[in-house]
Amino acid sequence: MSELSRRTVLISAAAVPLAGCGKNPANAPYVPPPAPGQKLVAAADVPVGSGTIVDGTLVTQPSAGVFKGFIARCTHAGCALSKVIDGAALCPCHSSTFGMDGQVLRGPAMEPLRARAVKVSGTEIVAG
């Protein structure tokens, strides 16, 4: 077996921490905001106390008939939120969770989700 050179050892040692600096595969590419009036989801498809993620927007219904919109990106590292379970939007990168009002339920995120204007148009939720 051949001995490793000092250079090979140093390069290998430096590469290990850098491996964690790459893009997280769960982090989806940038999604531009929807155009005003663009249909996002049927109001009936957003349960009270829950939400859905569509076109980079988290649409929630925190209470009956009240709809809110948020940019579906974690405020910690910018990862795309992956899903809504039991009234919480989940970040797959570092496990932050957000309530249906956009507030942080569990960190490491410290800032609430950024609002995105949505409104009801007939039976649809559209970009505001």
Q: Residue locations for each model-derived region?
A:
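N-terminal export leaders
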Residues: 1-21
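N-terminal pre-ligand scaffold of iron-sulfur
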Residues: 14-17, 22-86, 112-128
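Short cysteine/histidine-rich metal-coordination sites, predominantly Zn2+-binding motifs
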Residues: 88-95, 105-113
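Conserved catalytic-core motifs of eukaryotic protein kinase domains, centered on the activation segment
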Residues: 102
